[in-house]
Amino acid sequence: MTTTSKTSLQEEYVIDAVDHRGFSARRSITGRWRAAWFIIGVEVAERFANYGIGSNLISYLTGPLGQSTAVAAANVNAWSGISTILPLLGAFVADAFLGRYITIIIASFIYVLGLAFLTLSAFLIPNNTEVTSSPSSFLNALFFFSLYLVAIGQSGHKPCVQAFGADQFDEKNPQENSDRSSFFNWWYLSMCAGIGLAILVVVYIQENVSWALGFGIPCVFMVISLVLFVLGRKSYRFSKTRQEEETNPFTRIGRVFFVAFKNQRLNSSDLCKVELIEANRSQESPEELSFLNKALLVPNDSDEGEVACKSRDVEDATALVRLIPVWLTTLAYAIPFAQYMTFFTKQGVTMERTIFPGVEIPPASLQVLISISIVLFVPIYDRVLVPIGRSITKDPCGITTLKRIGTGMVLATLTMVVAALVESKRLETAKEYGLIDQPKTTLPMSIWWLFPQYMLLGLADVHTLVGMQEFFYSQVPTELRSLGLAIYLSAMGVGSLLSSLLIYLIDLATGGDAGNSWFNSNLNRAHLDYFYWLLAVVSAVGFFTFLFISKSYIYRRVDVV
């Protein structure tokens, strides 16, 4: 085949991708934005469903379920954390066995089932907003079973849908690679549109009509999302696994760690073969090999059929190890991020929420400000700031993903500082008007005081969360793209669990509701301001640690065709 004809085929067909019939995917009729918008639509519906439950969950727990503020906040953080850690399992199933498409369909069925049971449990529990008596153990068990069934559905849905969407763009094609970077921006914008709709519509229904209806509407939206996803099948590109490999990527990479550990004490005199090392490794001697590179060696006394690990597998394993320090530092962002669905909402309950005579804003609805700031800023970032940055840095994305993440971490620190100052003002207002021991009395302080912290958190999300999605997707081996997004989600999940643990320990140390707890159920006697200052320090320390680590990070190389 001539070079010209080979180039023509590469332009017409996508390497390592097939269409719905299993044939090589044609660039002109599959993938890119025609397929991506189907998948983005699915995510809008899923986020509508998720936030239709989660955004006002603390109000349901402290209302109809009769839990204290500290216990409810811990339960929300625990559910949120587990929901974003379980995708590691879903990604494993998708990347090792079922593939993204089938995993999404199965996970969606589980998701719908969980929402249906959740609706049933809310229908059976009295629709109280004030605590009178706790529901029966059976109804409590049904509610939490349903809630965690939804989390299991999310485990397969969340990492695979976004990875499947990004798969519609060929990273080896310069134009499609640039479009893929835009995809992550528009994905997040559209996702926030679904979140905003849920916060405005579903939360209002939950607060003013019925919790059962408020949980039932998300269930209907998830059914719609599943139908929409299947309708777009003919336009999708499906990733091919490496044909020469008989084992799944987890087995190959796991073998690298096993062999490397076994070969740690080997030196050059013990070797009978070294797997050929590509590119910049070709000049390395055995003594210079790092821990994982020892997997490229075979000892003299090995069995006849024993072979060294392939250099590609070692590179894949090394890429995963490099992500660990970055992942750890992003936890400093994830812990403050967990607060907007819990304590931000509880602050709003105590404040003046009337916008028109007889019309009050549900406290959880203020979360829509995060979505609004994202919807407003993403187009500016994608269409204005990225081209400006591209002209200066020559980077197709404007700035590197790590710089984008770091910018968001700075904004998150600022968010916590502002939140602490606003909470101090709220406590001063309660003291000034003699309302410290009247927690159910509305303070003469507008809920719009919370506006800056919500908007700042939205700007931080545009940088850090979108940056993390693109970073972890692009830096893992091609066959593990679902895992890459699950790694990003797990950081947010572990952050939520750490937040829950931190709340528990601080509540224990400061005496609970009987003492001067920072999280006293009477927020006028609590000290959320102290907690926010603590989180500001955690976030700042995390940022400087991230800055140190990111300077030495080596990005994964992509071969462009």
UniProtKB/Swiss-Prot annotation:
Bilayer topology annotation: Multi-pass membrane protein
SUPFAM superfamilies in the record: MFS general substrate transporter
CDD domains in UniProt: MFS_NPF5
GO cellular component: membrane
InterPro entries linked to this entry: MFS_trans_sf, NRT1/PTR, POT_fam, PTR2_symporter_CS
Tissue: Expressed in roots, flowers and siliques. Detected in stems and leaves.
Localization terms from the record: Membrane
Keyword terms: Membrane, Phosphoprotein, Transmembrane, Transmembrane helix, Transport
A Pfam family matched in the record: PTR2
GO molecular function terms noted in the UniProt entry: dipeptide transmembrane transporter activity; tripeptide transmembrane transporter activity
Bilayer-crossing regions: 78-98, 104-124, 133-153, 183-203, 211-231, 324-344, 361-381, 405-425, 447-467, 486-506, 530-550
Phosphothreonine found at: 103
Family label: Belongs to the major facilitator superfamily. Proton-dependent oligopeptide transporter (POT/PTR) (TC 2.A.17) family.
Protein name per UniProt: Protein NRT1/ PTR FAMILY 5.13
